[in-house]
């Protein structure tokens, strides 16, 4: 990569950071998922345990600060703060795409800082599916990661004028990562959701953890329109919502873990996703906005509030753990129900 391309990649990352703060408030479909209140839960507050084991480590709650940024020097302080917040709240953290750090050694510190600030935490590396297994291994080693997010961002690339246009071979790259890396590989969409067809392809390639990255959160079509003043209205509503994506995977009945991301903005959203069958729930843009506008302490307090709210929801649905939410009744209405009914016919 030449100097001009370095500058272009860095500028794009910083522009995305700025626009991430402008929450699109799109529908993630989880408003269609209704938990059933139990007036006689027969539980005490002390009975509720939010801790969970994931990727060999114990989390204080089934939450992750999802992939955001890294690369240009301006991102170092952001990643350092996110790592400290994850450590203080006992939840997982994923870095943004490490492609920039692989290509420019001067930018690696913006990624390695997370392990220095959170030495024992659960941290995920991140790289695109267009990269080789060797590059993926380097990304994992860079931050001593507990797992690798391999992001599937074809729609995002097509929206960006400077984005990639070659996507053949991605599945083989993923298969190679699964077979050669010594850590779990998590296939991750970045805002357009996962269909059952894609989930089956990933499963056949050996992937056992899928991050749905559903529609309803960061809207790259809207971001690109603001970045470039270039309309991409045809893709403005493209993709599968977070709720639909979780259900698409669940309908396959495969032994996979689902990470629910895409427009998660509250503990209630998280509880709804867990009730649909997710194991872990994450947010990216929502957390970033709080960090940049209110500071590190405010983000820490917000996540701790989510944990307390999730504990309340567990008690009021008769659950002693978040995992039990998946065994409780839910009512699905609206567009999500319409999607499920339509999919059964086609």
Swiss-Prot record:
One of its GO terms (biological process) is isoprenoid biosynthetic process. Substrate binds at residues 12-13, 97-99, 156. Keywords: Cytoplasm, Flavoprotein, FMN, Isomerase, Isoprene biosynthesis, Magnesium, Metal-binding, NADP. Signal peptide: none annotated. Mg(2+) binds at residue 157. The keyword Chaperone does not apply. It catalyses: isopentenyl diphosphate = dimethylallyl diphosphate. FMN binds at residues 67-69, 97, 126, 188, 218, 263-265, 284-285. Its EC number is 5.3.3.2. InterPro entries: Aldolase_TIM (IPR013785), FMN-dep_DH (IPR000262), IPdP_isomerase (IPR011179). GO terms for molecular function: FMN binding; isopentenyl-diphosphate delta-isomerase activity; magnesium ion binding; NADPH binding; oxidoreductase activity. Pfam families: FMN_dh (PF01070). GO terms for cellular component: cytoplasm. Homooctamer. Dimer of tetramers. Involved in the biosynthesis of isoprenoids. Catalyzes the 1,3-allylic rearrangement of the homoallylic substrate isopentenyl (IPP) to its allylic isomer, dimethylallyl diphosphate (DMAPP). This is Isopentenyl-diphosphate delta-isomerase. It comes from Moorella thermoacetica (strain ATCC 39073 / JCM 9320). The gene is fni.
């Amino acid at each position: 990569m030449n100097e001009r391309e370095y500058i272009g990649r860095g500028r794009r990352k910083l522009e995305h950071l700025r626009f991430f703060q402008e929450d699109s408030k799109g529908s993630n479909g989880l408003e269609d998922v209704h938990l059933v209140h139990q007036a006689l839960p027969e539980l005490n507050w002390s009975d509720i345990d939010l801790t969970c084991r994931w990727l060999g480590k114990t989390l204080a709650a089934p939450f992750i600060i999802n992939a955001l940024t890294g690369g240009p020097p301006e991102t170092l302080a952001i990643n350092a703060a996110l790592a400290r917040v994850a450590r203080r709240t006992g939840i997982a953290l994923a870095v943004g795409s490490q492609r920039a750090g692989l290509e420019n050694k001067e930018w690696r510190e913006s990624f390695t800082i997370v392990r220095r600030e959170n030495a024992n935490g659960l941290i995920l590396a991140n790289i695109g599916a267009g990269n080789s297994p060797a590059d993926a291994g380097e990304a994992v080693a860079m931050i001593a990661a507990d797992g690798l997010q391999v992001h599937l961002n074809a729609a995002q690339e097509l929206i960006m004028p400077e984005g990639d246009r070659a996507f053949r071979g991605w599945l083989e790259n993923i298969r190679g990562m699964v077979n050669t890396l010594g850590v779990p590989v998590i296939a991750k969409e970045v805002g357009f959701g996962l269909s059952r067809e894609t989930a089956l392809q990933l499963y056949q390639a050996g992937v056992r953890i899928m991050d749905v990255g559903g529609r309803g959160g960061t809207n790259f079509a809207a971001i690109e329109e603001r970045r470039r003043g270039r309309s991409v209205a045809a893709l403005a509503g493209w993709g599968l919502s977070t709720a639909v994506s979780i259900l698409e995977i669940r309908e396959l009945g495969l032994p996979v873990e689902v990470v629910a991301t895409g427009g998660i903005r509250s503990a209630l959203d998280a509880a709804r996703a867990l009730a649909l069958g997710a194991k872990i729930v994450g947010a990216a843009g929502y957390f970033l906005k709080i960090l940049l506008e209110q500071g590190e302490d405010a983000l820490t307090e917000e996540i701790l509030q989510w944990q307390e709210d999730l504990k309340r929801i567990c008690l009021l649905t008769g659950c002693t753990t978040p995992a039990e939410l998946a065994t409780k009744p839910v009512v699905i209405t609206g567009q999500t129900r319409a999607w499920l009914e339509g999919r059964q016919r086609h």
